[in-house]
Regions:
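N-terminal strand-loop element at the rim of the active site
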Residues: 5-11, 23-68
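Conserved acidic donor-binding segment of nucleotide-sugar-dependent glycosyltransferases
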Residues: 312-313, 317-324, 333-338
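Short hydrophobic beta-strand element within catalytic cores of glycosyltransferases
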Residues: 297-300, 310
């Protein structure tokens, strides 16, 4: 199949999953065309099976805000015609599903019928999409997609609760190549980050308010008083400076390392002992899954799709949002001795196998075949 993938090209979960899906589909022999405003951060190499088409937006003084969705829909039309694309897969409802629908209509007028799969990722539904300004367009786009998927049962439930959805929503969870995270680094550079007797605690996110990064600092502050440890924070975002200031005020700035964005999170997770994700909301928790595949147990909130990923008492622990005291106590339980930590590490890695690329990507391929067959039926 020839598949057009529309996504955000950033470090956020939706862009990462869309890119990894495209790479996996190319490995399966499909021809994949990424269509977005810049090359996705996880897309390192292009090939005969992997293509990138940049969406450019002419700058007209008449427009206060440049119309990206119009430029995207026009680019989709051009690429479908030029490359004989079979199916469009748009990730994140706003504005991609709406732009995809417009492209479908323009192509239909040219006698080209192409199905569109829409994948819902989280904040496109629970935060942005539920705003009264966007809600009618999001509802329309979902209901007029040929196939709709959600990355968790929790997000599917939220979508059906918040919107008037007539379409069927299939749950296809996020995934990773678990082999990528399996001890391929012999020394892992652990000695650069911590002393031999110290535990390494890690947090990876876009450092937005929803991630509750200051909770991460508070949890670590409690833990480090009981267990010698270092905290690594990977990512960039608006909560970085407040987190830095909080660490300074608590007198633990020398134990907290801000590493910025990284395309090689696996090289950091390989020497981590615990992963903190106390988010206000997570539709799935891809960062937690990557940590689990590296054999890193999880301390997380019990919100959204996280309970579907982090299994209570096995891969880690779940706590109510904002319950810093309980999260810190659970972290200490895991880190207190090597035997307990090793048990949680083994269970975390085992649990991550449920979401391996080899298990999940065929589900997308089956959906593609289903909608293609339906679109080609007389």
């Amino acid at each position: 199949m020839k598949i057009a993938i529309v996504c955000y090209p950033t470090f956020g979960g939706s862009g990462v999953v869309a890119t990894e899906l495209g790479l996996a589909l190319a490995d399966h022999g499909h021809e994949v065309h990424f269509i977005t405003y810049k090359q996705p951060v996880r897309l390192d190499l292009l090939s005969k099976k992997i293509h990138f088409h940049e969406v450019t937006i002419p700058d007209y003084p008449l427009f206060k805000y440049q119309p990206y969705e119009l430029a995207l829909s026009s680019k989709l039309v051009d690429m479908v015609k030029l490359h004989n694309i079979d199916i469009m897969h748009v990730h994140y409802a706003i504005p991609h599903a709406y732009a995809g629908y417009m492209a479908k209509q323009m192509l239909a007028e040219a006698g080209i019928q192409i199905p569109m799969v829409t994948t819902l990722h989280g904040t496109d539904i629970t935060l942005v999409g539920n705003h009264p300004f966007y809600k009618p367009a999001v509802t329309f786009s979902i209901n007029n997609s040929d196939c709709v998927t959600s990355v968790s049962q929790s997000l599917k439930d939220d979508t059906l609760r918040l919107f008037d959805i007539k379409n069927t929503i299939d749950v296809v969870p996020n995934f990773i190549d678990t082999k990528r995270f399996e001890n391929q680094y012999t020394d892992c550079q652990r000695s650069i980050m911590a002393l031999p007797h110290e535990r390494i605690i890690t947090h990876v996110s876009n450092l937005r308010p929803v991630k509750r990064v200051q909770d991460v600092i508070h949890i670590f502050d409690t833990v480090q008083k009981e267990i010698p440890s270092k905290l690594l924070i990977v990512g960039e975002g608006p909560q970085k400076e407040p987190a830095e200031l909080l660490a300074e005020s608590l007198g633990i700035a020398h134990k907290v390392v801000f590493l910025g964005n990284s395309n090689e999170v696996d090289k950091i997770l390989c020497f981590s002992d615990l992963f903190l994700l106390p988010s206000e909301k997570e539709s799935f928790g891809l960062a937690a899954l990557e940590a689990m595949a590296s054999g890193v147990p999880i301390i997380s909130s019990n919100t959204g799709g996280l309970p579907e990923v982090n299994i209570e008492g096995q891969s880690g622990f779940l706590s109510p949002v904002g319950n810093i005291k309980e999260m810190a106590a659970n972290a200490i339980t895991i880190l207190k001795d090597d035997a307990t930590l090793d048990g949680f590490k083994a269970n975390a890695r085992k649990s991550s196998k449920r979401f391996d690329t080899k298990t999940i990507v065929p589900k997308y391929e089956a959906l593609y075949e289903k909608v293609l067959f339906k679109s080609q039926a007389p």
